[in-house]
């Protein structure tokens, strides 16, 4: 009589633990100042008809911050709104064999925000388990003809959907200059490992400190996911 088979393995899927976060940032000009402030503080500030706090001051929209200026002639710049940016969308895949290069020509920018990520990140074992994986990217600037690594980034975790992250590059070279993204991790050659990488966009940032004299304003920053992304 033959031996019975071993106990069947039930595949285990690790939880997704990578989540993109995008902040919505806006300044709203209320009118000519000076005027009185919000009657009920943050409860008086509505986003999609939803107040930032309830009557007891507890957050209704988590992660939101707001600043207020009444419209004085000598008012200070709103904190957290000291820069403006122009985003250029790319959405291009980055492979080990083909780094992606772009040229920056804008003369007056102070910094660059580089947004990149993975289409998904998961490794499936021979037993069907779906586990976290990792992938490494280099973000480089060309300085005096040489490629210099400014950021060495490893994305480590699991996600079955797109995940994006951002880094800021300061101390930029004289314009024009080249920027490139290099994939250090070998490209996957099997469906068992999903780790395609992409360069989503770059944002040219100019540092500004505007006071908006004689204008009453509200500045709001909130996680875009609170309103469907």
Annotate each language-model stretch with its function.
Residues 1-229:
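Polar, S/T/G-rich
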């Amino acid at each position: 009589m033959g031996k019975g088979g071993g106990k069947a393995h039930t595949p285990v899927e690790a939880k997704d633990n990578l989540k993109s976060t995008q902040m919505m940032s806006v300044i709203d000009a209320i009118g000519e100042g000076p005027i009185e402030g919000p009657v009920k503080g943050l409860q008086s500030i509505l986003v999609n008809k939803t107040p930032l706090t309830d009557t007891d001051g507890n957050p209704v929209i988590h992660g939101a911050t707001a600043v207020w200026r009444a419209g004085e002639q000598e008012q200070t710049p709103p904190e957290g709104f000291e820069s403006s940016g122009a985003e250029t969308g790319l959405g291009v895949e980055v492979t080990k064999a083909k780094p992606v290069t772009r040229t920056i020509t804008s003369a007056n920018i102070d910094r660059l925000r580089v947004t990149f990520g993975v289409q998904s990140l998961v490794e499936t074992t021979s037993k069907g388990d779906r586990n976290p994986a990792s992938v490494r990217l280099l973000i480089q600037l060309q300085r005096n003809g040489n490629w210099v690594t400014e950021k060495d980034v490893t994305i480590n975790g699991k996600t079955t959907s797109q995940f994006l992250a951002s880094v800021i590059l300061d101390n930029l070279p004289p314009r024009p200059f080249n920027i490139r993204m290099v994939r250090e991790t070998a490209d996957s050659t099997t469906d068992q490992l999903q780790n395609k990488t992409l360069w989503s966009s770059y944002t040219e940032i100019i540092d500004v400190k505007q006071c908006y004299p004689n204008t009453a304003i509200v500045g709001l920053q909130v996680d875009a996911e609170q309103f469907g992304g």
